[in-house]
């Protein structure tokens, strides 16, 4: 709305137009060249370019290096396997994005298709995208407002701005007000002058906020950190090994070949694919619970969320007005008040207030009685008189009216005592978040104030329990709404969220005036239970402030106004019946109404996270174990403990069965979880070095007691690395003793056992290597599993020292 009220002539002068003739066609064309089309610009990326982008990032480079190294040393089987892993990772990511609706496209579709415009003195229908500032347009009931329009002629409009501002009730507009692009006309008809089009509209600025909202997931950061750690470690160790071997006079070609194979084994090429598949399977589980995952990394983000910002209207509440406790006055009964109000309502108008009153009449069994009355004349609500009125006949004739309490008091010529009483009631209702409606009846030659009907948007039936469960999961829930503070406080109290509700608009004014600093603003936002009088840019700011305080933030919403914050949040959740724009901006889309399904989604996300963390610890442990053992054997003993072929077989047999980790049974964490890289790397390194010790011990046993040849020793060590490696996953999969519940899933257990058996047959029978026989193979089974118990003890000591749950 204008800060200074302008008259029609001033507005015409401002926009160089006339409400009598509109713009000329030529002038409209000129302005179209200046301002562009009234639409949301669409940034299109060719699908091939988008697909190739999945192979141009640090994670992909890591895998591509491994593939190139494999090709250089002509290990074609390894080369093909790595390429498959690379493609799996790329295809999963591309398909996930391809299926997800484009945010900008949906926001564009939200724009009105056609508009009634006055050009060259004639009214005509044109595509809404051709509107320009200064155009004179006509909007009426049922229209989607095609641009930001200054209303200059007509009685009034009632528009639904809930998808834009979050206000639960339609808003009244009069001359001088602005009807915003994307809002829906519920009542009335007015003429206006186009103020802004496209991205310059209030709606368009929302799009800019969506485009501005960019985020890098903690999953991506974790992958890069682990990749950097392992690659740097591998490069340093391999460089030392190559230097020492060349100093010893070994063949450059032979040394380089082994070094390249070792480098390939050190790069966790399968890690992104395994983690993507784990998240994809988790996404399927969530889909069964009516939560559609659009971006796989959102699962990992949701597991770590510690603050949930929930939109109020339609998410925590029904977005449907209902009547509170009826207050009857002047000797009238509650039934009388509802009867009079119902007679002053029309069902066919589908007005939110009228529907609430008629529903209350149905509850009180008054509908049959109402049918006996005949409405002779009905005066609908308008912003000028602020009430409805009906002339009614039955056995007698009388009038009824409902509207703003102050207006009804004036209609009744109420005395001071009644006015004071009604005003006290209205003030008390307002403090508790209710809107008040006055009701009067005209009998015996005068109007009588019959009573007051409180109205409010009630919480969903499932909301209080959902809020309680979310809190039990260690997640703080904050309510966000465009409604006034009193309404927000009432709903927050009813839901058990808390009553520390602040007006974000007032807080931002203080920030702008310099009364508080940015740090203080962020602190107040962090401590608040909820926010009232919120606009789209405010929601974005709220999420940003919480993120700056170190929180992982989830945001639920259903309207266009929620889209920027949904995109900015670590995990954006579009609830059931959300607008296309909200769905497009979100990471997760709920199909069931309310937020109860979020409880299931958080629990499932945490289970998925546990599986991912187990695999990450396992993968780092194995890389360290093999790298250090091979390196030290070469440097200290001058022996290659395994061949290049064995390293390739290890890579295949170790990673393929571990895909089953996606189906493993896990303990659900009771609080938000995050990638604790320090703890993960310390635990992995300790278990990896323990594996190095156990490998040297078996090396010693083989040489001193078993007197194996070098070829047999290599086969023996190969079997040890496979069996002990697979035993590691049983150690890392649970933060308790490995024999405690939950037990491994059947798929994981038999997947591991199957590859263990294959590895045993290969070593015992001498396939691709020297045979060691079944006696030594069985001995190795016993040795590997005894050491598994030792590793489990090391794990428990470290978990206690590092205070990891």
Swiss-Prot record:
Origin superkingdom: Archaea
GO biological process: monoatomic ion transmembrane transport; proton export across plasma membrane
Transmembrane segments: 53-73, 75-95, 226-246, 258-278, 615-637, 641-663, 680-700, 712-734, 747-769, 773-790
Keyword Cell membrane in annotation: yes
One Gene Ontology cellular component: membrane
Localization of this protein: Cell membrane
Annotated membrane topology: Multi-pass membrane protein
Assigned keywords, A-Z: ATP-binding, Cell membrane, Membrane, Nucleotide-binding, Phosphoprotein, Translocase, Transmembrane, Transmembrane helix
Active site, renumbered: 311 (4-aspartylphosphate intermediate)
EC assignment: 7.2.2.-
Family indicated by similarity: Belongs to the cation transport ATPase (P-type) (TC 3.A.3) family. Type IIIA subfamily.
Protein name: Putative cation-transporting ATPase MJ1226
């Amino acid at each position: 709305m204008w800060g200074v009220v302008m008259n029609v002539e001033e507005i015409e002068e401002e926009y160089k137009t006339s409400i009598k003739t509109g713009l000329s066609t030529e002038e409209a064309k000129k302005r179209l060249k200046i301002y562009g089309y009234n639409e949301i610009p669409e940034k299109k990326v060719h699908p091939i370019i988008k697909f190739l982008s999945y192979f141009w990032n640090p994670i992909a480079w890591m895998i591509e290096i491994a593939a190139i190294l494999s090709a250089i040393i002509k290990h074609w089987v390894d080369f093909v396997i790595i390429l498959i892993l690379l493609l799996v990772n790329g295809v999963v990511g591309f398909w996930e994005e391809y299926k997800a609706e484009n945010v900008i496209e949906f926001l564009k579709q939200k724009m009105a298709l056609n508009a009634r415009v006055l050009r060259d003195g004639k009214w005509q229908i044109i595509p809404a995208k051709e509107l320009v500032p200064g155009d004179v347009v006509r909007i009426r009931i049922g229209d989607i407002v095609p641009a930001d329009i200054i209303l200059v002629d007509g009685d009034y409009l009632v528009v639904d701005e809930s998808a834009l501002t979050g206000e639960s009730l339609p808003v009244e507009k009069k001359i001088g007000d602005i009807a915003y692009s994307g809002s829906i006309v519920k009542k009335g008809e007015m003429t206006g002058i186009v103020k802004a089009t496209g991205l310059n509209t209030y709606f368009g600025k929302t799009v800019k906020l969506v485009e501005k909202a960019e985020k890098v997931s903690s999953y991506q950061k974790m992958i890069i950190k682990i990749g950097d750690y392992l690659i740097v470690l591998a490069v340093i160790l391999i460089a030392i090994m190559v230097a020492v071997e060349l100093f010893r006079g070994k063949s450059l070609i032979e040394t380089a070949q082994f070094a390249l194979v070792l480098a390939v084994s050190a790069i966790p090429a399968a890690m992104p694919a395994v983690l993507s598949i784990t998240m994809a399977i988790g996404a399927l589980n969530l889909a069964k619970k009516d939560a559609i995952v659009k971006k796989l990394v959102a699962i990992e983000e949701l597991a770590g969320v510690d603050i949930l910002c929930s939109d109020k209207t339609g998410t925590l509440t029904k977005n449907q007005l209902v009547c509170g406790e009826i207050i009857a006055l002047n000797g009238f009964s509650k039934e009388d008040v509802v009867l009079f109000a119902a007679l002053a309502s029309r069902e066919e108008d589908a007005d939110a207030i009228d529907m609430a009153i008629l529903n209350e009449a149905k509850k009180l069994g008054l509908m049959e009685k109402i049918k006996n009355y005949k409405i002779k004349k009905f005066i609908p609500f308008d912003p000028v008189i602020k009430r409805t009125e009906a002339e009614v006949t039955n056995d007698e004739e009388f009038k009824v009216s409902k509207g703003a309490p102050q207006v009804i008091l004036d209609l009744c010529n109420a005395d001071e005592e009644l006015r004071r009483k009604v005003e006290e009631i209205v003030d008390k209702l307002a403090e508790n978040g209710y809107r008040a409606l006055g009701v009067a009846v005209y009998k015996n030659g005068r109007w009588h104030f019959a009573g007051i009907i409180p109205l409010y948007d009630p919480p969903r039936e499932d909301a209080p329990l959902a809020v309680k469960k979310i809190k039990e999961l260690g997640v703080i829930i904050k309510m966000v709404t465009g409604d006034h503070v009193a309404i927000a406080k009432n709903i927050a109290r009813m839901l058990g969220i808390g009553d520390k509700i602040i007006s974000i608009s007032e807080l931002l004014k203080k920030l702008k005036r310099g009364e508080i600093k940015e740090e203080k603003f962020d602190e107040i936002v962090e401590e608040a239970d909820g926010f009232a009088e919120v606009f789209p840019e405010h929601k974005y700011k709220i999420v940003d402030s919480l993120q700056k305080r170190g929180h992982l933030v989830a945001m639920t919403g259903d309207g266009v106004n929620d889209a920027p914050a949904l995109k900015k949040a670590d995990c954006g959740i579009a609830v059931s019946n959300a607008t296309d724009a909200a769905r497009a901006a979100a990471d997760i889309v709920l199909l069931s109404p309310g937020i109860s399904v979020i409880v299931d989604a958080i629990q499932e996300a945490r289970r998925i996270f546990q599986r991912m963390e187990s695999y990450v610890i396992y993968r780092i442990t194995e890389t360290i174990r093999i790298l250090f053992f091979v390196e030290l054997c070469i440097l200290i003993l001058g022996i290659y403990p395994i061949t290049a072929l064995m390293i390739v077989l290890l890579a295949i047999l170790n990673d393929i069965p571990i895909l089953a980790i996606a189906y493993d049974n896990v303990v659900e964490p009771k609080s938000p979880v995050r990638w604790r890289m320090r703890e993960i790397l310390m635990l992995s390194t300790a278990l990896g070095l323990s594996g190095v010790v156990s490998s040297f011990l078996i090396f010693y046993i083989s040489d001193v007691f078993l007197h194996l040849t070098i070829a047999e020793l290599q086969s023996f060590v190969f079997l040890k690395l496979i069996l002990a490696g697979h035993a590691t996953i049983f150690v890392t999969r649970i933060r308790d003793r490995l024999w405690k519940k939950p037990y491994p899933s059947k798929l994981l257990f038999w997947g591991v056992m199957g590859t263990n058996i294959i590895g045993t047959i290969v070593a015992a029978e001498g396939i691709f290597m020297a045979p060691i026989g079944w006696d030594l193979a069985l001995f190795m089974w016993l040795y590997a599993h005894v050491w598994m118990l030792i590793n489990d003890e090391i794990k428990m000591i470290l978990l206690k020292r590092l205070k990891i749950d």
